[in-house]
């Protein structure tokens, strides 16, 4: 193992590792079709997966070459290099906006209607609703909201450029990261949806974690806590990401015996901000608890899976499930109607009419039945755990099917984590990967539907962590020297 690691430290060893990685993922990606790159792929006469694969490989090769140069001397940037990356991000965003126009998601329109009417409910996070409502007053036709989203994307590009410059990476690496963000995220960053803001905040937080490896300074802390605060304000499940990341940062601070109170205070502040946004703010505004049954879709689908596949289920328990969740004939019909729409077969699809949907869909039928559904799950699922876990396994398809970009991004990240493990680096080198683990848990266990947007952070983090892993792998001594004696 030491001999193999020594070879990987060399320039050609790293190139060989990148080529081997490319060959493996080429075999996975050749039959794939990637939605955002399909048009470009058709022009080239190849599949979308091949185009995406070569983009990722080019970023990997550029990072490896940049690393080799950075290990000998710091790469000079032109004056205002970060501004060049900001201009690049803004140019890409405006071009896409000009070509596609202002595109709004159903979530955005629903929140905007709440903000304009003043009749708040908890279907969408109130912090997001109040934000877009305030921006809506500044400009017509959602122009202010689009401008704010573009500003956050440009900010993410700017902090990425600042980090690349501090690491001594060439300007080309930062430009490559910014250029890959839009296509890897299926252009969703230019759509008015809270997941676009969420993804930009995730990139900013990841930059902060990457910067922490070299130095714990104001830039690292500002990007880390700022990005994390944006996450918890936009989605309640981001509290899991904040908790996992905060625990990792606090553990590293304790091992280094430096800045523990400041880290604890910062993480506590972020978590309190999330709790205030999703618990205290609805109470203060008197928002109706109209959260539809989608938040119960996963436990309810587990119960449906037990009814369909577990022949040993006692008749009285089967009757209880069907009485609370859905009549058995309807349940079985929907289970077999659209198996490819994981997580949506009981929500929107397969119903005969609007009246049938309103009567039986989880969205309407389970609204306000949280206690009953969760109590039934706690009582019955432990005895049928093997069958009940099938929906969770099905939800991982988004992360393991190479025809989807998140699976490709996850493969890149696993490869990079393996390289860092070979280098036997300290724990703080793996901090940027912690939020991704929490995001995988969210996609698998918390997300109620099979939607690409839930995995956008995985895709957005991939090109950034390409450069990070390369810089850390090839030039770890600089970071170790600055933090010598602090764990």
Model regions and ranges:
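Membrane-interface alpha helices of multi-pass inner-membrane proteins
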Residues: 221-235, 246-247, 267-277
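Membrane-interface anchor segments at the N-terminal boundary of transmembrane helices
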Residues: 143-144, 362-363, 371-437
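Membrane-proximal stem/loop segments at transmembrane-domain junctions that anchor or position
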Residues: 286-399
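Transmembrane-helix motifs of polytopic, lipid-linked glycan transferases
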Residues: 147-168, 204
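Specific aromatic-rich, kink-prone transmembrane helix
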Residues: 116, 159, 199-214, 220, ...
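Short acidic/glycine- and proline-prone juxtamembrane loop motifs at membrane-interface regions
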Residues: 190-198
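Extracytoplasmic catalytic/substrate-binding loops of multi-pass membrane glycan-assembly enzymes
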Residues: 98-111, 119-131, 135, 139-143, ...
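Start-transfer (signal-anchor) and selected internal transmembrane alpha helices
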Residues: 1-94, 263-267, 428, 472-480
